[in-house]
């Protein structure tokens, strides 16, 4: 089992211990270590206060000092070091009104969300598992630490995180945990949509997404999310992992809607991808010739095209017409892309200025149309991408 990331962080824990404090690995890295999965981020918990951590290490960043978290920079890596803490009453089902620093590991672990995430480990790889997290991991069960209703009342996002973990790990959800989710799911309306979107993005890429997505529907989670609340999400089916952006595009195409995406507070890149997914899905059923395929591959992001093609079963499950597989498939997409004479308009050897000078014409609506005609002619092989050849073609084929 790969311990390299733990070993890279070991000097931090040892330095904290050398100064008379406790320090442990904690959270997802320990869970994944117990499961034999690849480890990514290392989180450290300690009895030292943020001020004490800052006095021990020369290079620190107070990313969340008021909540007990200090980033320690070691060997050009950032390590999140958080003081043992007990959280005060939560407000709005999403954040504690304050935190109290404590010196006891048990008290820190009992505030965490799920038993599998409430295991600590020392530098000798000894596990501190007060809530039977290893047993739940072995039984492939997601269970809250303590009373589920209390954990979800503290932070409603834990319910979406639970479904995300189910999707990623293919675990079952403990009965009492699931029943608390059924009772309290409406509380996610108090959450920021940004936090929900982060979890949904991971959930949609999980290997067990079909089950988790069906739980989102049965628990009526979508009823309490901006954008989705206006839609009958029970009509949407997800049978395999897809991007969240593709899901939103599928919803738009299936219901033939053009709702504003602003309530989801997505990045400009995400919005651009969603709009292009919609255009691709609408264009796919109309491609029957190699010439049409060339224009299609030229016009759209081939990575997004491939994502849609890989998700063909999801489109079918939502009654969205797919592509003609003999003309449009992963191989023909790659071959067509490879042989395109140019990949965007910037590659074209003429521009609007050249055209206006050649035709002795002023700018107007005609210019955009002619540039598009030239693009298509080059992409489909009717004219080579050379200025003299293009202008000859314009003289013979274009009227303004």
Curated annotation (Swiss-Prot):
Presence of the UniProt keyword Kinase in the record: no
This enzyme's EC code(s): 2.7.7.72
> Which cofactors does the annotated protein need, by name?
Mg(2+)
Please list the residues that bind Mg(2+).
41, 43
Q: Which GO terms describe its biological process?
A: RNA repair; tRNA 3'-terminal CCA addition
Can you tell me which residues bind ATP? 28, 31, 112, 155, 158, 161, 164
- Substrates-to-products reaction catalysed: a tRNA precursor + 2 CTP + ATP = a tRNA with a 3' CCA end + 3 diphosphate; a tRNA with a 3' CCA end + 2 CTP + ATP = a tRNA with a 3' CCACCA end + 3 diphosphate
Alphabetized UniProt keyword annotations: ATP-binding, Magnesium, Metal-binding, Nucleotide-binding, Nucleotidyltransferase, RNA repair, RNA-binding, Transferase, tRNA processing
Q: What class of enzyme is it?
A: transferase
> Which is an annotated Pfam family here?
PolyA_pol_RNAbd
Q: Does the keyword Nucleotide-binding apply?
A: yes
Any coiled-coil regions, as ranges: none
Question: Which molecular-function annotations from GO does this UniProt entry contain?
Answer: ATP binding; CCA tRNA nucleotidyltransferase activity; magnesium ion binding; tRNA binding
Annotated positions binding CTP = 28, 31, 112, 155, 158, 161, 164
- Subunit text: Homodimer.
Any extra remark in the record? A single active site specifically recognizes both ATP and CTP and is responsible for their addition.
Q: What does this protein do?
A: Catalyzes the addition and repair of the essential 3'-terminal CCA sequence in tRNAs without using a nucleic acid template. Adds these three nucleotides in the order of C, C, and A to the tRNA nucleotide-73, using CTP and ATP as substrates and producing inorganic pyrophosphate. tRNA 3'-terminal CCA addition is required both for tRNA processing and repair. Also involved in tRNA surveillance by mediating tandem CCA addition to generate a CCACCA at the 3' terminus of unstable tRNAs. While stable tRNAs receive only 3'-terminal CCA, unstable tRNAs are marked with CCACCA and rapidly degraded.
Q: Which family does it belong to?
A: Belongs to the tRNA nucleotidyltransferase/poly(A) polymerase family. Bacterial CCA-adding enzyme type 3 subfamily.
Q: What is this protein called?
A: CCA-adding enzyme
What is the scientific name of the source organism? Staphylococcus aureus (strain bovine RF122 / ET3-1)
């Amino acid at each position: 089992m790969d311990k390299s990331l733990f070993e890279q962080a070991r000097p931090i824990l040892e330095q904290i211990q050398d100064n008379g404090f406790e320090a442990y690995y904690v959270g997802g890295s320990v869970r994944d270590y117990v499961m034999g999965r690849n480890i990514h981020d290392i989180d450290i918990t300690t009895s030292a206060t943020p001020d004490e951590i800052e006095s021990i290490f020369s290079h620190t960043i107070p990313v969340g000092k008021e909540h007990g978290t200090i980033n320690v920079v070691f060997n050009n890596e950032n390590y999140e070091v958080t003081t043992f803490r007990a959280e005060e009453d939560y407000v709005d089902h999403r954040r504690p009104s304050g935190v109290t620093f404590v010196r006891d590991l048990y008290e820190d672990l009992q505030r965490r969300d799920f038993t599998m995430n409430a295991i600590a480990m020392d530098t000798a790889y000894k596990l501190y598992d007060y809530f039977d997290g290893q047993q739940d991991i072995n039984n492939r069960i997601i269970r809250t630490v303590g009373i589920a209703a209390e954990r979800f009342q503290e932070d409603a996002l834990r319910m979406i995180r639970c479904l995300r973990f189910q999707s990623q790990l293919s675990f079952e959800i403990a009965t009492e945990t699931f029943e608390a989710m059924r009772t309290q799911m409406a509380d996610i309306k108090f959450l920021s949509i940004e936090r929900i979107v982060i979890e949904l993005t991971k959930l949609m890429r999980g290997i067990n997404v079909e089950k988790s997505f069906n739980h989102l529907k049965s628990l009526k989670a979508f009823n309490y999310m901006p954008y989705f609340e206006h839609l009958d999400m029970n009509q949407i089916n997800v049978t395999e992992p897809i991007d969240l952006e593709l899901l939103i595009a599928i919803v738009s195409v299936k219901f033939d809607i053009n709702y504003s995406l602003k309530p989801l507070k997505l990045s400009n890149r995400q919005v651009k991808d969603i709009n292009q997914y919609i255009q691709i899905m609408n264009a796919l059923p109309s491609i029957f010739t190699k010439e049409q395929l060339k224009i299609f591959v030229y016009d759209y992001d081939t990575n997004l095209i491939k994502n849609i093609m890989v998700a063909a079963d999801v489109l079918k499950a939502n009654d969205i017409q797919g592509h003609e597989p003999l003309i449009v498939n992963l191989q023909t997409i790659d071959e067509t892309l490879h042989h395109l004479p140019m990949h965007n308009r910037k590659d074209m050897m003429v521009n609007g200025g050249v055209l206006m000078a050649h035709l002795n014409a002023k700018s107007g609506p005609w210019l955009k149309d002619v540039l598009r005609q030239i693009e298509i002619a080059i992409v489909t092989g009717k004219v080579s991408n050379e200025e003299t050849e293009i202008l000859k073609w314009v003289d013979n084929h274009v009227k303004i």
